[in-house]
Design a protein with these regions (language model features):
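Non-transmembrane, aqueous-exposed alpha-helical and coiled segments at domain scale
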Residues: 1-174
């Protein structure tokens, strides 16, 4: 879920590759927050989780691999649903509040889909472009479940994006 959580904040910051994101203090802090506060705690074996995180960060930092965010962004609705949403849902099911960094990542995905050309299912893309956040989140066909409970948080994240810019909104989300 680390790639998926970071892709749209990075693209909205006009950062083109994964390696560049790791060198960017704001994006690196966001990734660290997502990984260590939300993704890793949902994995069963703590030692395996830490080894996984280390391997992910090493792969992301490899200067010989130029993972372009535009390529990673392909089909992001299904990727978010499979890779980030389970962590978000597990966190909330455990009684914790909505994890703002993961909701911010979703707000960035929606903002990107609304404002830029994307390569994804044309029907899904059109639905996002044409509808407000509450309708987008309530659409179980997009996310596999009704995400209406995220409306307030994602709306606030989006307002922060518009009012303060990506970096300040990202800092707020952490």
């Amino acid at each position: 879920g680390a790639h998926t959580a970071l892709v749209f904040p990075s693209l909205l910051c006009k950062v083109e590759t994964v390696g560049e994101s790791l060198k960017d203090k704001d994006l690196a802090a966001f990734l660290d927050c997502c990984l260590h506060r939300y993704i890793l705690p949902t994995l069963d074996n703590r030692a395996e989780a830490e080894a996984f995180a280390k391997a992910v960060l090493e792969r992301f930092a490899n200067p010989y691999i130029h993972h372009r965010w535009q390529s990673i962004a392909l089909n992001s609705i299904s990727k978010y649903t499979a890779r980030v949403l389970p962590t978000l849902l597990d966190t909330v099911a455990g009684g914790a509040p909505v994890p703002r960094p993961l909701a911010f990542s979703l707000a960035c995905l929606i903002e990107y889909y609304k404002t830029r050309p994307v390569t994804d299912d044309p029907k899904q893309t059109a639905f996002i472009k044409e509808n407000p956040i509450p309708a987008i989140l309530a659409n179980a066909e997009l996310w596999g479940t009704d995400l209406s409970f995220l409306t307030d948080t994602v709306t606030i994240c989006t307002e922060k994006l518009h009012q303060s810019g990506v970096r300040e909104a990202m800092q707020w989300s952490m």
